[in-house]
Every structure is written in structure tokens, then in C-alpha cells.
Amino acid sequence: MKQGLILKSVLSAAIIASLAGCATAPAQQWEADKTYKLTILHTNDHHGRFWQNQYGEYGMAARKTLIDQLRADIEAQGGSVLLLSGGDINTGVPESDLQDAEPDFKGMSKIGYDAMALGNHEFDNPLEVLFKQKEWANFPMLSANIYDKATGKRLFEPYHIFDKQGIKIAVIGLTTEDTAKIGNPEYIGGIDFRDPKEEAKKVIAELKKKEKPDLIIAVTHMGHYQNGEHGVNAPGDVALARYLPAGELDMIVGGHSQEPVCMEGPNLVKKNFKPGDECKPDIQNGTYIVQAYEWGKYVGRADYEFRNGELNMVSYNLIPVNLKKKVEVNGETQRVFATSEIKEDSAMLEFLRPFQEKGQEQLSIKIAHSNGKLEGDRNVVRFEQTNLGRMIAMAHMQRAKADFAVMNSGGVRDSIQAGDITYKDVLKVQPFGNIVSYVDMNGQEVLDYLNVVATKPVDSGAYAQFAGISMTVADGKVSNVVIGGKQLRLDATYRFTVPSFNAAGGDGYPKITDHPGYVNTGFVDAEVLKDYLEANSPIDVNRFAPAGEIVYR
């Protein structure tokens, strides 16, 4: 970590703050008894998806067309627009990751984002990369609760003031304090991620004294948890709204938990939201809370009316960006647009295409070398423990700082041959873009889980590969479970990883996404394996060879 870069950012934030402090807040600019229209558009958890996926869904070119059209329509009716992002622009697909998300940040600038919250994945790279990204963005990256440990000063602009037809809007940025424990220690050792609730309280007091805004919006990367039940995660948006005096924040535009925040009733999230469904935002302690799922799949739209200092939401919806659904046509399954197709912006496509092509080229660059075959052939990996299955599990275990790891063999799609290894080889093994997730459970829960997962039959994708654990599997249950060299204790707490697909119940695994100890790390499996291969090259395949840890009888 380079202190010069930190100091540069601290000085920049300090200058901004001092200038704000010197200025006298202007008198009220809006007209009494006049109704103003204000629309907040928002996305979150972009995770490198600047290009459409293989089915032609989402992507920044289609998003630009949609947002340009919305902005034009709203302004033609006399309204104003503010476009916000809940953060996590980084980490998701190799074409973006290999280029430090340059197409993503520059693409956001072209779309016209007004501000974003810093997400935890903005700290997956060295700070030099983040400050470079800050220069690519022509909009402020906000976070009031990130401090430099050495100076005690904020690293980033805590808030930004916008004027929309005389309505003074303060937008505060907040970042989950969990970044301190899920981020890379090498890059964040000198950074203090403070309690965002406390920092919000401080900043709001400062704003009321110095700026006297008409509206205060928090753009956050903290997560939305039903009824504030955040489990092992740091408190999220619901806790923030409840912590502050009623109505202190007019709105929270969130991210991090990567879900559509659509409510069925008070403190009850709507399950299985689909494109085109009605979406009612959460309301907590007088504050609207919204989130637009992930990857630019939706653009959230909140329409407000502002009159005599009062803000009222008129409507809210999540607009799908070329999402598709499966239908049966003449006995064959096809994907069709769930709603009307959005044409991709040609200028944005022209801008992004060189980045996509460059990213594809970089996939052929050598990342590691192996002295033997890493076994992932379907007729082997679905029948027995293999060195590749174990390596993938070990990579997940290391990234999540877990005690052991579970990896479904159906997620291992190919072998890696001896010799040079490229990223393309990795993507052949793990092409699905599953996310590494983990859960903290007590020993009894772990035993119950293993009794289901470890007993899955061979010759199926559900057959599990393991790392960090040994056991005997017989008569439909497990015994002699040893984790970290010690016998399983029913009253102890253990952390294990599992692909997001299986965490959601895929392959008939127990669904654990609702478990209070569950965490979706946001790290894509192929990226995690790539990093592990690079760090451990040259690869000695014998190191990963199973040694009878899992005994089937």
C-alpha cells in the first residue's frame, strides 16, 4: 500500500470538505406551492458486466439506451433525474477484471452516473487501481466511513450536493464495515472501515449545519436484510434507517446483498421476483429503501413529487434490461425477451467492443504451469475424489478463510492437462460464473448438512468433492468427521464454502441462503481458481492428490 496515494486522496477530500465549510448555505431556491418532479434511477453490484451475456441479456449498451430514454422522457415532462450506483463495480467477469474495470467506469461516465457508493469489491485490488478508477469516473465515489488509519482522515468524499431545479439534495456514501474482514488484508491493512450508522449520524448533523439540504439520500453498499435480521453480516440498510431519527434519510439506494428489494408487506420480502412484477420498496422508520438486484439486470426507477419541502413517492418499479425467459416452442426450449427488447446504443457498443476483444485475447495468456493432469473428466470426477476437485475446494476455502470446503462435481466441467495453463483453460473447467459462498454453522448443523451432501450418489453432478475435512460415509450417513485435524464438536462453530448454485438448493443440496450465517462473497469461482493457480505455480499435482480422507463403505 502506498501512503502517498492515500495522502493524495485524503488531501483531496480535505480540500472538498474545507471548501464546503467556507461556503454559506444559500437560501431556499424552490418555489412555494409548486410541485416538482424528481426521479431517482439506480443500479448496484455491476460486477464487471459491461458486455451482454451469452443470451444477449443486460450490458451497458442497452442500459445506456434505456437511461437516455428515461431521462429524456422525464425531463420533457419538467422533471429532474439523479442516477446513482450502490457500488461493487469490480470483480465478476475476466474481460473486465483483466482490465481493472476500465470499460465499466468509463462506460458509467458515458451513461451519466451522478454518484456511486464504494463497495467492498472496490478494494479487491491495490489502492493504485482504485485511484486510477477514480480518475476514469467523471462522478464522485462516495463513502463517509472509510478512513486512513495513519492520519485519521477520510479517504473519500463523504457526500456530494446536487441542485435539481432549486431542490438541494445531499447524497451520502456508506460502505459495509465487513470490508475489513472480507477484503484482501494486503490492500486494506492501512484502512479503517468505521460503523456506517455512526458516520451517517455525524455527516447528517454536519450537513444540516453547513448545507441545509432539502433532501438527504444515502447511497450505500451495506445490504438489505429482511426485518434487519443480518445474521453474521454487518448491519445493513434496515438497521441504518432504524438507528437514525425517523425520516432523517429520505431514501436509501442500496447494494451488496444483490437482491431486488420488493416487499409483500411490512418486513416481508417478496420471494421469486420476476421481470415485469410489481415492486414495492421497503419503508423503514420513514425512509424508502431500494435495491436493483445485480449486474445491471434492472434499472430501478423511483418517481417523487416535491412540494413545500415535503417528498412523496408517486411510483416505483424495476425495469428489466433485456432479460429473457424460457418458453416451449414446437417442443423445444427457447429464450425470449421477458419484456420489450431494448436496442443497444451503437456509440456505446463501438466504445466497449475493443475492451471485450482485448479481454478475450488476454484469456489465452499463460497463468500457471502444471507437472501433470488435473483430473476433471466427467467419468472420473463424478465417481471419486480428484486432485482438481480438491484444488478448487482448497481455493474456495482459502479465499473465504473457511475450515473446510464442499464442491459439487457437476461444477467441474473439464480437466486441465499437464503443461502451461491459461485463463481459457480455467473457464472450461468453471464456465458458469458461480459465486463462492460460505456459511457459519454449529457442529450439529454441519453434521446434518453432511448427512445430505456427502451421501449424494456417484455418477451425478451432486457428488461432492471436499477439502479440509475427512469422514467415513456409510449407510446413508457420515461418521468420524475430522475438521482441521480435530474431531467434529457439536457445540463448536465451523465455516465452510459451497458454490452459490448449491447454496440455493441446486443438486438437491440443503438450501442455506436463508441461514443467518450465510454470506455470498461476490467472488466468481473461475477468478478464484485462476488466482489460486497463479499463486501456487508451478503446480505439483501430487500436492492435491486425495489421500483417503473421504472413505465410502
Curated annotation (Swiss-Prot):
Give any single GO term for biological process.
Answer: nucleotide catabolic process
This protein's name: 5'-nucleotidase
Q: Where is the lipid attached (S-diacylglycerol cysteine)?
A: C22
Please name the source species: Vibrio cholerae serotype O1 (strain ATCC 39315 / El Tor Inaba N16961)
Q: According to Swiss-Prot or TrEMBL, what is its membrane topology?
A: Lipid-anchor
**An MF annotation (GO) of this entry:** 5'-nucleotidase activity
Site annotation (Transition state stabilizer) points to H121, D124
Give the signal peptide range. Answer: 1-21
Keyword hit for Lipoprotein: yes
Q: Where does a divalent metal cation 2 bind?
A: D88, N120, H221, H256
Give the residues carrying a lipid (N-palmitoyl cysteine): C22
Question: What family does the entry list?
Answer: Belongs to the 5'-nucleotidase family.
Keyword set, alphabetical order:
Cell outer membrane, Hydrolase, Lipoprotein, Magnesium, Membrane, Metal-binding, Nucleotide-binding, Palmitate, Signal
Read off the Pfam families from this record.
5_nucleotid_C (PF02872), Metallophos (PF00149)
On whether Metal-binding is a keyword of this UniProt record, the answer is yes
Main subcellular location of this protein, as a coarse class: membrane
- Disulfide connectivity for this sequence is none
Which residues are recorded as binding substrate?
F432, F501, N502, A503, A504, G505, G506, D507
